[in-house]
UniProtKB/Swiss-Prot annotation:
The keyword Transmembrane does not apply. PANTHER family: HEAT-INDUCIBLE TRANSCRIPTION REPRESSOR HRCA. Gene3D superfamilies: 3.30.450.40, Heat-inducible transcription repressor hrca homolog, domain 3, Winged helix-like DNA-binding domain superfamily/Winged helix DNA-binding domain. It comes from Mycolicibacterium gilvum (strain PYR-GCK). One of its GO terms (biological process) is negative regulation of DNA-templated transcription. This is Heat-inducible transcription repressor HrcA. NCBIfam families: hrcA. Negative regulator of class I heat shock genes (grpE-dnaK-dnaJ and groELS operons). Prevents heat-shock induction of these operons. InterPro entries: GAF-like_dom_sf, HrcA, HrcA_C, WH-like_DNA-bd_sf, WH_DNA-bd_sf, WHTH_transcript_rep_HrcA_IDD. Belongs to the HrcA family. Keywords: Repressor, Stress response, Transcription, Transcription regulation. Disulfide bonds: none annotated. One of its GO terms (molecular function) is DNA binding.
C-alpha cells in the first residue's frame, strides 16, 4: 500500500471522526486545523478530490464541505486498528449493574437500557433462543396435595413457573416419584427435545392411578411451557434516541420505526449472529432491508460456555461512533453471558 493511499485514509478517518462529532460537512482547512496530518491544505484538498472520485465521501448540496458515504464508513470500520477497551472501573460498573438483576427478564431489561444509555442509540436484545437452550433443573413444589407448582430452569437463566391441578391428591411418596420421573425425562435435554421426552414419559407410563394421572397432567402443562417461542421476542431500549438524529435518516425514519415495532427485520439480522464475541457492523444497504437504508446495525451474540443464547446490538444512523459502539456492544454482551452463565 503506497504512502499516498495511507495518507488519504488518514484524511478519510479524520473526516469520519469530525462529521460524527459535529454533524457538519468537513472542509480541507478544518482538517488541517484540527488534525496533525503533516501536509498542506492543498494536498488535503487533492486527497479529498480523490476520495470523492472513488466514492468514499460526497458533497451535500448546501455545503462546500464533504461527508462520508456508506462506502467511506465501511472502509473506516474495516480498517479500525483497535477498539478502545473499557476501563476496569467501567467494566465493574456494568457487571455490578447486570448482576443486580433478579431474573432473566430483569437482566435483559437492564442490559438493553444500559446499552442504549452507553451508545445513545436504539438497543435491542433477543430473548434466549429456544433452539439452543437446555433444561438445567426442574422443581416440583406441592402447594396442596392436589395442586403443584412446576418450575423449569434453563441454562440461559429462563425460569418458567406453571400451576398443575391434579384433580386427585397425591401423597409424599408419589410426589417424590413424580419429581424423579419428570427430572430424569427433562434435565440436561434441549428444550426442542424435552417436550417430546415428557410426552413420551406420559405415554409410556399410561394406565390409571394417581401417579399416572399426575404425570399426564404435568406433562400437558410442561409441553405448553417448553414449546413457547420466546426467541421471537425482542427487548428494545432507547427508541427515543432516534428523534435526536431525525435529519440523519432523511425521510426513512418512519419506515425504520415501523420495522422496529414489527421486529421481523431486526430478528432476521440478530439470527445471523452465531458466534459470541464477534461483532458485526452492517452499514446502510448492507442490512439488506429497505426499511433500514439509512441506518447502521452493530450486532453480536451473547452466551456462556461456548453456547449462544441470543443476539443483541445497536441500531442508529450511519453517522455513528463506530469504535465506541463496537466496544460497548461487545462488553455488554460479554457480561450478559457471564451473569446468566453463573446463575
Amino acid at each position: 500500500m503506497g504512502s499516498a493511499e495511507d495518507r488519504r485514509f488518514e484524511v478519510l478517518r479524520a473526516i469520519v471522526a469530525d462529521f460524527v462529532a459535529t454533524k457538519e460537512p468537513i472542509g480541507s482547512k478544518t482538517l488541517v486545523d484540527r488534525h496533525n496530518l503533516g501536509v498542506s491544505s492543498a494536498t488535503v484538498r487533492n486527497d479529498m478530490a480523490v476520495l470523492e472520485a472513488e466514492g468514499y465521501i460526497t458533497q451535500p448540496h448546501t455545503s462546500s464541505g464533504r461527508v462520508p458515504t456508506e462506502k467511506g464508513y465501511r472502509e473506516f470500520v474495516d480498517r479500525l486498528d483497535d477498539v478502545k477497551p473499557m476501563s476496569s472501573a467501567e467494566r465493574r460498573a456494568i457487571l455490578s449493574f447486570l448482576e443486580s438483576g433478579v431474573d432473566l427478564d430483569d437482566v435483559l431489561r437492564r442490559a438493553v437500557r444500559l446499552l442504549a444509555q452507553l451508545t445513545r442509540q436504539v438497543a435491542v436484545v433477543q430473548y434466549p433462543m429456544l433452539s439452543t437452550s437446555t433444561v438445567r433443573r426442574l422443581e416440583v413444589v406441592a402447594l396442596t396435595p392436589a395442586r403443584l407448582l412446576l418450575i423449569v430452569i434453563t441454562d440461559s437463566g429462563r425460569i418458567d413457573q406453571r400451576i398443575v391441578e391434579l384433580g386427585d391428591a397425591i401423597d409424599e411418596d408419589e410426589l417424590t416419584q413424580l419429581r424423579d420421573l419428570l427430572g430424569q425425562a427433562l434435565e440436561g435435554k434441549p428444550l426442542t427435545t424435552a417436550s417430546i421426552a415428557v410426552s413420551d414419559l406420559a405415554s409410556h407410563l399410561g394406565g390409571q392411578g394417581r401417579l399416572a394421572n399426575a404425570v399426564g397432567r404435568s406433562a400437558t402443562v410442561l409441553v405448553e411451557s417448553l414449546v413457547e417461542h420466546r426467541e421471537e421476542r425482542l427487548l428494545l431500549g432507547g427508541t427515543a434516541n432516534l428523534t435526536r438524529n431525525t435529519a440523519d435518516f432523511g425521510g426513512s425514519l418512519r419506515s425504520l420505526l415501523e420495522a422496529l415495532e414489527e421486529q421481523v427485520v431486526v430478528l432476521r439480522l440478530l439470527a445471523k449472529q452465531q458466534e459470541a464475541g464477534k461483532v458485526t457492523v452492517r452499514i446502510g444497504h448492507e442490512t439488506e432491508a429497505e426499511e433500514m437504508a439509512g441506518a447502521s446495525v452493530v450486532t453480536t451474540a451473547y452466551g456462556s460456555a461456548g453456547k449462544v443464547f441470543g443476539g443483541m446490538g445497536v441500531l442508529g444512523p450511519t453517522r455513528m461512533d463506530y469504535p465506541g459502539t463496537i466496544a460497548n456492544v461487545a462488553a455488554v454482551a460479554l457480561y450478559i453471558g457471564e451473569v446468566l452463565g453463573n446463575r
